[in-house]
């Protein structure tokens, strides 16, 4: 199959860019963008490679994505080696095919076609690419955004190429994401012999009523754009492994995916009040990995919906479900942010794949979005 989108995707897949190692992917993208007149600024932080590229001036549409991928798992379980792209029955297999090297290829090819047809486009077209999205995300998009904000860089619209679709490309568009707040909680007790509980203070027993009440809380109601806030306990650890020793500490880690109905400070206050109510001795550490954000109907959402309807003849659902993405950092710049990418059914899985025709379709959608906003 000869297609510039597929060929570029295959070239990217062949580079085993396990997060945060870029493995040469960005050099490939930069070469293509510079060839059509983009100015490229490398913005590396620690072990992470990033770049910000732009062409033109004025109202700015940026395409954002990541070159890094998650580990492939057991390579012997793949139908072909995970970093050797293969097409079978119209499906392109390889780690990163859907998340998100296919989107990157579609973006770049769309830009090449757009510039060829609109060499003097009136707005500014930009790219924000990182090699640290799948792992810590500490030195990737967030650092680039901070640097751009420090110099008052303009960003009006941003399309993130995360795999948003469920069954066919464009059936779901993400116009927002929930916030994510993690609590690392240690309940302190006194270690002792199980036969002499009066000489010890078992933190598991002490914390049980607190945890029971915590999981029963209804944090908020859903609203027009977001599902109700959810809380899930992710990890619990206590004890020495011996059956005759009561633990001295209980560690509990739980995560909130919260809507715009709440703030992280409201959640923290409610948890701390509950800890005090149960008279627990505790140490707590919070990690806010992202605030909720929402892009209402406007020029970007309308352009994305128009592109999907034009090429796939379906009306996309606008959803805010799922995990976090780098869109949460970009939204801080005041930009309208939307995610549109391929079908996500196999992301992070053995035999990750994407319909090759979907990537061709995605490139056309991206180009039409460019034409509506910055031509």
UniProtKB/Swiss-Prot annotation:
Annotated positions binding Zn(2+) 1: 66, 99, 162
NCBIfam families associated with the record: dapE_proteo (TIGR01246), PRK13009.1 (NF009557)
Keyword tags: Amino-acid biosynthesis, Cobalt, Diaminopimelate biosynthesis, Hydrolase, Lysine biosynthesis, Metal-binding, Zinc
Cofactor: Zn(2+); Co(2+)
Enzyme Commission no: 3.5.1.18
CDD domains: M20_DapE_proteobac
Native organism: Shigella dysenteriae serotype 1 (strain Sd197)
Catalysed conversion reaction: N-succinyl-(2S,6S)-2,6-diaminopimelate + H2O = (2S,6S)-2,6-diaminopimelate + succinate
Active site: 68, 133 (proton acceptor)
Top-level EC class as recorded in UniProt: hydrolase
Textual note on the cofactor: Binds 2 Zn(2+) or Co(2+) ions per subunit.
The protein, known as: Succinyl-diaminopimelate desuccinylase
